[in-house]
Design a protein with these regions (language model features):
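Alpha-helical transmembrane bundle of multi-pass membrane proteins
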Residues: 1-26, 48-334
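Cytosol/matrix-facing amphipathic helices and coiled-coil assembly/linker segments
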Residues: 37-51
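Short intracellular "coupling" helices and adjacent cytoplasmic loop segments at the cytosolic face
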Residues: 26-38
């Protein structure tokens, strides 16, 4: 962590354009004078100027072209579903579930709990490669559907609790954690910052994280009570929540993989103007070049100093920058 640079967008926001160029050059494995680096640096400057004021929590209530409220709710919903799909019920109480709900002996339950944690750790590895290649939206759908079916297997085996069915119930729990580890575990931490507008990203991320811990607390508190009341009912409950999350992800989660953050703004603005689902616009819209993003921004009426993202009288305007070198000052003025 000590060796990691600041993000180029943060450096641009603070006026450190030279440092931002160096980070972009390192990301692209090229020089600071490369056309792609200069283009992205200029586009970041433009976006930071448009969204110069830091959005308050009140700004999240906006429903205009920026779709701040919808985007905040989408980000928070990913954290809600992460918890209410049963992950921590399985993770925290895996040994107890094997022993008390599936009725395995104590020693075997401890062994299976250790194997469960090992499988969980190993199953996270594919996410490093799949998140960009497969995409966020598809992984959400795969995760929710796979988790739901896994808990249906567990529930069905526990309705008639025999020794043979207990093995099937354990398989269902293992399948659940495999699906969770490479899909719904990482995605809710990646998706909300990508989906939210630059000026409201901090406030929206705070709400998203708060949603995670509130729902985490709720699930951990009611799981033992629910499990004691109905051994198979708790798995039916979590299965239904997972299956409910599938249409939610389908209709409300546009794909963000491979997109500039500015393209996400255009997707929601275009969806607002054309009265379409954001995921439909994202599917129809090809990856845009810098010039195409500028032109679409003009076409959608988003080119006036963040007119659709900053209400009249809101904020104090762009923050004055302190530059650490003459080069940065010249870059800012030029």
């Amino acid at each position: 962590m000590v060796c990691l640079p600041e993000s180029p967008r943060w450096l641009v926001k603070k006026g450190y354009y030279t440092e931002a160029g160096k980070v972009l050059a390192a990301l692209y494995s090229t020089t600071e004078e490369d056309e792609a680096v200069l283009r992205d640096l200029e586009f970041m400057k433009s976006d930071v100027r448009k969204n110069a004021s830091t959005g308050s929590f009140k700004a999240l209530l906006s429903t205009g072209k920026g779709k701040e409220l919808q985007r905040c709710l989408i980000g928070s919903s990913t954290q809600f579903f992460q918890q209410f799909t049963g992950c921590n019920a399985a993770i925290y109480y895996s040994t107890l579930l094997f022993e008390n709900t599936i009725n395995l002996d104590h020693r075997l339950s401890l062994v299976l709990g250790g194997v469960f944690a090992t499988v969980y750790a190993i199953a996270t590895i594919p996410s490093f490669f799949m998140i960009e290649k497969v995409g966020r939206r598809k992984l959400f759908l795969i995760g929710f559907l796979g988790q739901g079916l896994s808990f249906i297997i567990t529930m069905a085996c526990l309705v008639n609790p025999t020794k043979q069915n207990a093995k099937g119930a354990a398989v269902g729990i293992y399948l659940f954690i495999v699906f969770f580890a490479f899909t719904i575990l990482p995605l809710p931490w990646i998706y909300p910052p990508e989906i939210n507008l630059l000026k409201t990203r901090t406030a929206a991320a705070a709400i998203s994280t708060c949603t995670n811990w509130i729902t985490n607390f709720a699930v951990v508190m009611f799981t033992p009570v629910f499990s004691d009341t109905s051994g198979w009912g708790i798995y039916l409950f979590f299965a239904l929540i997972n299956l409910l999350a599938v249409p939610t992800a389908w209709f409300f989660y546009p794909e963000t993989a491979g997109r500039h953050l500015e393209e996400i703004d255009l997707i929601f603005a275009k969806a607002h103007v054309e009265k379409k689902w954001a995921f439909t616009v994202a599917n129809e819209m090809p990856k845009l070049s810098y010039e195409e993003m500028q032109q679409m921004s003009k076409d959608l009426g988003m080119n006036e100093v963040g007119e659709d993202y900053v209400e009249e009288g809101e904020g104090d305007g762009p923050e004055k920058k302190d530059f650490s070198s003459d080069d940065e000052k010249a870059a800012h003025e030029g």
